[in-house]
Every structure is written in structure tokens, then in C-alpha cells.
């Protein structure tokens, strides 16, 4: 299912800037190796401008801790999840849940075209960042959930849950919040 344009992650832009971001991270590593603080600061500014995100030195240290350069570059390239102009429809929510749950699900075939890596690697590298950096924050920002409800653990914590079960958990939490609001009004 195609989501509304305002919901979809701008994967085309991410793919376009990905090589530049990857190159800048490599240049940052080289500048760190020769302890060129001025060059490091300049590269951080370039990354922030290119991605439209506030990137810090700490953000760049992540790939040294195990995420890897490709994963970090893709995280930087992903657009920020928007605050939607109208609430998510149940079908849209279910589509997003499917995308989070099923790594073989391919909502963005254009991502895999012309990439210099095997398709399976790309899916693996990009599926988790897409969930963590885009889909989870999108849901957290746009669903009317109780403050005590953590979508990542309360809805998606059971790895064996089917997408329809996760949808039911989220809808139940949203209904509970609505019911509680009505009782206090």
C-alpha cells in the first residue's frame, strides 16, 4: 500500500545524498586520525547542512561503537518524521506496522536500484535504521497514546506478534486514552 506523501519517508532524497554523507563520514574519520579539529568541525557543519539535521561529534562516534559507517550514513540521510496534518487512518497504521515487522517487505524498491552492494545487505543495513529513525518516531509523534505507553516495547516488544496483533494493541491503548479523557471531562 502506498502511504500519503506526507507520511512516506523521502527515500529518494536519502538515496541521493547517501554517497556524499558516506564520503563526509570517511573524511571526518581521516580528519580525526590526524587530529585536525578545525576540519572535523567543518565536516560536521557540512553534514548538518546536507542532511538538515543537527549533527554532533557524538553522533559521528556511533559508527566506531558498532553501527558501521553505512548504517550511520543512512540514519543521517533519512528525513525527520513529520507531524501529520490529519490523523493516521487504521489502514495506514497497519501498513507502517507491516513495514516495521517484516524486513522482506519492500515499500521502497527504488532504494535498491543502482546500489553497489548486494540487495540483501542493503535490506539488512537499512531496515533497522528506517524503523528506529523514521517509523517509530513517526508513530510516537502522531498517535494519541497514553504517556505510559512505550510503542517500542509495549506494542512491538513481542517478536512473535503478528502485525494484526500489534495493530490491536495500539488501537486498544489509543481507545483507553480516549476513554480516560472522556471520564475526566
Language-model region placement:
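Terminal, compositionally biased segments
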Residues: 1-4, 85-89, 183-185
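N-terminal low-complexity, intrinsically disordered segments
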Residues: 26, 30-87
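Short runs of predominantly hydrophobic/aromatic residues within well-ordered alpha helices
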Residues: 40, 90-94, 132-135, 166
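Short acidic, low-complexity intrinsically disordered linear motifs used
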Residues: 87-101
Amino acid at each position: 500500500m502506498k502511504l500519503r506523501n506526507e507520511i512516506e519517508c523521502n527515500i529518494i532524497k536519502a538515496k541521493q545524498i547517501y554517497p556524499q554523507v558516506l564520503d563526509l563520514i570517511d573524511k571526518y574519520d581521516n580528519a580525526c586520525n590526524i587530529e585536525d579539529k578545525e576540519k572535523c568541525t567543518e565536516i560536521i557543519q557540512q553534514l548538518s547542512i546536507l542532511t538538515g539535521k543537527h549533527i554532533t561529534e557524538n553522533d559521528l562516534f556511533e559508527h566506531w561503537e558498532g553501527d558501521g559507517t553505512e548504517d550511520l550514513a543512512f540514519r543521517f540521510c533519512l528525513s525527520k518524521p513529520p507531524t501529520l496534518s490529519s490523523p493516521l487512518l487504521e489502514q495506514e497504521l497497519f501498513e507502517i506496522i507491516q513495514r516495521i515487522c517484516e524486513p522482506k517487505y519492500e515499500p521502497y524498491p527504488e532504494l535498491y536500484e543502482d546500489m553497489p552492494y548486494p540487495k540483501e545487505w542493503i535490506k539488512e543495513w537499512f531496515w533497522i535504521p528506517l524503523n528506529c529513525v523514521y517509523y517509530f518516531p513517526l508513530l510516537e509523534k502522531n498517535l494519541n497514546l497514553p504517556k505510559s505507553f512505550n510503542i517500542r516495547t509495549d506494542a512491538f516488544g513481542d517478536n512473535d506478534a503478528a502485525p494484526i496483533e500489534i495493530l490491536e494493541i495500539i488501537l486498544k491503548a489509543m481507545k483507553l486514552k480516549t476513554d480516560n479523557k472522556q471520564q475526566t471531562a
